[in-house]
Amino acid sequence: LLDSMFIWDTIGEEYLRSLGKESHEDLKETFMTLTLEEAAEYYREHYGVSLSVKEIVDGVNAMVEQTYRTKVTLKPGIAEYLAWLKENGVRMCVATVTDRYLVEETLERLGVRHYFSEIFTCAEVGFGKDKPIIYQKALEDLGTEKSDTYVFEDMLFALNTAKTDGFPTVGVYDRHEVHQDELKELSDYYIFDFTDPILKTI
């Protein structure tokens, strides 16, 4: 939906540096399946950060806010595809690892918030995308059959979670996901962007 994965490539290290600390691992990989709150706990336990979980989450969000407000864009073809889905009576919602206020604001700025009945965030659900809870909550909101409810994901681990739970899946290319071959192999459909004509056949 949003071309925003680039933000999370280095934010873990950048936040530590803002506190005068250096990471001793690839935090992108470490944090891949964690919620922001879980990542904050990790900072506290493994890097001796004395701030509260809320203070850490607020600090990370403050660092990404400006990027979301100015640089994050829609993935190619998504605006037209959402309009087509809406015209054809397809219900849609969002399931995201990003905090609600950032997603709400960005979708409004990009003119697509009205397409979605609801936004579900990992923070509010209480589980990351390594668990299927967020997809199950979204399914409940949509009121559709699981077999007819497609999960679009550009992260391999998240798509694997949805597929393992029985959802049909669409893998979406993202240059920041290094496991493209695995994503393509695992997904029921795989697209480079949202201009792919196969989307109107699903």
What are these regions (language model features)?
Residues 83, 99-100, 104-202:
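Asp-based, Mg2+/Mn2+-dependent phosphohydrolase catalytic module
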Residues 54, 72-75, 97, 110, ...:
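Non-catalytic, surface-exposed connector residues within folded enzymatic/regulatory domains
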Residues 30, 95-97, 152:
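Structural motif
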Residues 1-88, 101:
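N-terminal helical cap/lid subdomain that shapes the substrate entry/recognition surface
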Residues 88-90, 167:
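Short phosphate-binding/catalytic loops that engage adenosine nucleotides
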